[in-house]
Curated annotation (Swiss-Prot):
PROSITE patterns: SOYBEAN_KUNITZ
UniProt keyword annotation of Glycosyltransferase present: no
A Pfam family it matches: Kunitz_legume
Keyword line: Disulfide bond, Seed storage protein, Storage protein
Disulfide bond in keyword set: yes
Protein name: Albumin-1
Family that this chain belongs to: Belongs to the protease inhibitor I3 (leguminous Kunitz-type inhibitor) family.
Disulfide bonds: C135-C141
Role this protein plays: 2S seed storage protein.
Highest taxon listed in the record's lineage: Eukaryota
Matches recorded under InterPro entries: Kunitz_inhibitor_STI-like_sf, Prot_inh_Kunz-lg
Amino acid sequence: ADDPVYDAEGNKLVNRGKYTIVSFSDGAGIDVVATGNENPEDPLSIVKSTRNIMYATSISSEDKTPPQPRNILENMRLKINFATDPHKGDVWSVVDFQPDGQQLKLAGRYPNQVKGAFTIQKGSNTPRTYKLLFCPVGSPCKNIGISTDPEGKKRLVVSYQSDPLVVKFHRHEPE
């Protein structure tokens, strides 16, 4: 059986719980910015934050069959969406851009969105660190890593090549 996923404090991740996803290497959070030819008023790219931003996310099982699982397990098919404003409710998606490859964007804005689900696996030998993966329908899962664009934005991308982004989950404490 797959192991439960734990937050940084050692508690099991709860299905539909709210968590801040933080880079293990430098403590950076996840941000949404405009990249490339996106309208700066409508940022769509999911990136590793270069500013002090910590948006909370909601992580939920894609399995709609009752009873719903109580906890998030490794290798479970997951949906991730932002849980705090200004992007509350916006779902993470993967969009195929040639020749740049697959990038994480807010869902529903692109015709070339890749069907699939996210999943979580152990990220390193350090306890309670994980990597995020994207599993396209009918294909093996690939790591989510970082690709720094010419503007210095650290885009989240789906790749066999890039090192995985290793993260910890912190339970979101509303202010």
